[in-house]
Amino acid sequence: VSSSDSMILLGSGQGIELGRWLLRRNDWSGPLVELVAPEHGEPLPDHMAAAIASEDRVAVLAMGDGSACRTEKAPGYLDDRSIDFDNSVADALTAVDAATLMNLDQQLATELLVAGRYVWPIAARIVETDSGNWRGELRYRDDPYGVSYFVALWTSVGIPSTTGP
């Protein structure tokens, strides 16, 4: 992040507030574009697409929780479907699997109280806008308070390799 020219903060509800706090705590002083995540399937907002397409190094802080149904004391109580759902999100975040993140089951995500259900598809579209290769790393995953939290780092690693004859 420190080598980035500008920052896009993407979230919904409390995610934006938490993102601001994280940026202040880490002394971010560069340009900041904030975007409250629109509903799944909406196009990438023009100002985000322009920022990603620019020559600047842009960092994206995408804030969104997984399911809130991981334990009996969770906000949504225990729902066994949350295990497979959150595992698939963790795998997609690790693999920078844009297709999986853009095609989340929105009905199930709503039932599982997934705050990231609108955020992750937009982050995935950002990756798809870039022609480079991406590397993912899941740095944190836990379920405190029955809510699934992920911290993943996606890094652009340059132009795509070409294969073929």
State where each predicted segment sits:
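A general structural motif
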Residues: 4, 55-57
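Generic hydrophobic alpha-helical segments
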Residues: 44-52
